[in-house]
Regions:
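N-terminal and secondary-structure boundary signal
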Residues: 1-330
Length: 330
């Protein structure tokens, strides 16, 4: 067994994945949905990826022994043709992937909780409704919770640099105490603040809004490293079916990557996702910071090919290249 194994699997060309990657269609839960070629291919990909990772690491036993499994997607201003925009932006976890992950997990533990507090300004309940996460919860008989509405418990982090205290919503207290199994299912995408945003940054959506805003500045890399002292995913599955390049949390452009990345070491898994986007993790301050803290234990053993897509990086300048392209005289 090698706990730092990372599995990468892709869907072959020819199966269109650019349909319903932000929001589930109306026929979700019916035969017409589950018989679609893309849905069958995604389900097979999720099952293959997790089956191989289980064979390599044996994480299933911890799922079986846990009180429940808490699965956190990454929902960021889900606007699925909702009258605000014409386009679909690949910023949120693909609900087709989430559905397959829940189905796989329930083979080993029936008690599953989908938990999220999506980025402003979209209320999480609205994000659940638009994306279809509420229907996944209903169809699969899971719990569903908006974390911003939950009571919190205060923890002190003596080793932290900037997050000396943290408020954890009660659905994640079992994760902190080692009773529950925590799965992070982020989107493969770039980010304006941290260059990339993947599995362990997804924990930012756990803490209350006021704490997210605190040190959400040039010290954000230290803040995210601090979070690993208390919230470390037991399993990370990165949704890279349709990646997002650009200035998250602003709208991003789709990248047809057609892959999933999964691992039980959150830092090693995120480093593989970073390389897939075409970035050297050693040149990204966030990964350097977590390395200084001792959370990085060397490169993972990768099962599968690691393609490189050269995502367009986020542009943090006030007036970026796109602006100057359209307004060259300013």
């Amino acid at each position: 067994m090698n706990e730092r194994t990372v599995v990468v699997r892709r869907i072959e060309e020819g199966i269109a994945l650019d349909r319903d990657y932000v929001a589930l269609p109306e026929d979700y839960g019916k035969d017409s949905y589950f018989q679609r070629p893309d849905i069958q291919a995604i389900r097979s990909l999720v099952f293959e990826t997790l089956d191989i990772l289980e064979e390599k690491t044996g994480f299933r036993r911890k799922i079986e022994e846990s009180r429940q499994v808490v699965i956190k997607p990454n929902l960021v201003s889900v606007y699925h043709r909702s009258g605000m925009f014409e386009e679909d932006y690949p910023e949120s976890t693909d609900p087709r992937v989430m559905d397959a992950v829940v189905e796989w997990v329930q083979k080993y533990n029936k008690k599953v909780l989908i938990a999220e507090s999506s980025g402003k300004p979209m209320p999480t309940a609205t994000s659940f409704r638009i994306s279809g996460m509420d229907r996944i919860a209903g169809y699969r008989n899971t719990g569903l919770v908006t974390l911003e509405t939950c009571p919190v418990r205060r923890y002190l982090l003596p080793k932290a640099k900037v997050m000396k205290e943290v408020l954890i919503p009660t659905p994640f207290v079992g994760v902190v105490e080692g009773k529950d199994f925590y799965i992070s299912v982020p989107k493969l995408k770039t980010n304006l603040y941290t260059r990339v945003t993947l599995g362990f940054k997804n924990a930012m959506g756990v803490i209350p809004y006021a704490l997210r805003e605190r040190n959400h500045n040039y010290r954000i890399d230290e803040k995210l490293a601090d979070m690993l002292y208390i919230l470390r995913p037991d399993l990370t599955l990165i949704d890279g079916l349709v990646g997002g390049e650009g200035n998250t949390p602003a709208p991003v452009d789709p990248v047809d990557c057609r892959l999933l990345v999964a691992g039980t070491d959150p830092v090693a898994t995120d480093r593989v996702g970073c390389r897939i986007m075409g970035f050297d993790p050693d040149e990204i301050p966030l990964f350097r910071e977590v390395g200084k803290r001792g959370f990085y234990h060397g490169e993972a053993q990768v099962d599968g090919e690691v393609p490189v897509f050269h995502f367009r990086p986020a542009d943090p300048s006030l007036l970026g290249d796109t602006f100057h392209k359209h307004f060259p005289n300013i």
